[in-house]
Amino acid sequence: MASRKNQLAIDNDELMRRVEALINASKNRYRITVQVANRAKRRRYEDPDDIEDGWMKPIRRAVIEMSDELTEPEIIGDE
């Protein structure tokens, strides 16, 4: 799990750049905000063990995943 932690751990500046990229790529700022929140909520209930570890909050993970989907379209899943 240590490699997973290092892979997903990013600093706040990088996280803000990713948030801005998501907002800029979206036609509707409200909709992308709701999509990120829904993904974080879904992740929270799907993986309760990750919450107990406490190394990454679901909202940060959702932003990272969704911004990766912008840059790497082959990993886009069903939404």
From Swiss-Prot:
Q: What are the GO cellular component annotations?
A: DNA-directed RNA polymerase complex
Name the source's superkingdom.
Bacteria
Q: Does the keyword Nucleotidyltransferase apply?
A: yes
**Keyword Membrane recorded:** no
Give me the reactions it catalyses. RNA(n) + a ribonucleoside 5'-triphosphate = RNA(n+1) + diphosphate
Q: Which InterPro entries match?
A: DNA-dir_RNA_pol_omega, Pol_omega/Rpo6/RPB6, RPB6/omega-like_sf
* Biological processes annotated in GO: DNA-templated transcription
Q: What class of enzyme is it?
A: transferase
Q: Which UniProt keywords apply?
A: DNA-directed RNA polymerase, Nucleotidyltransferase, Transcription, Transferase
EC nos: 2.7.7.6
**NCBIfam families from the entry?**
PRK00392.2-5 (NF001574)
**What interactions and quaternary structure are annotated?**
In cyanobacteria the RNAP catalytic core is composed of 2 alpha, 1 beta, 1 beta', 1 gamma and 1 omega subunit. When a sigma factor is associated with the core the holoenzyme is formed, which can initiate transcription.
Q: What name is this protein filed under?
A: DNA-directed RNA polymerase subunit omega
> Which organism does this record belong to?
Synechococcus sp. (strain JA-2-3B'a(2-13)) (Cyanobacteria bacterium Yellowstone B-Prime)
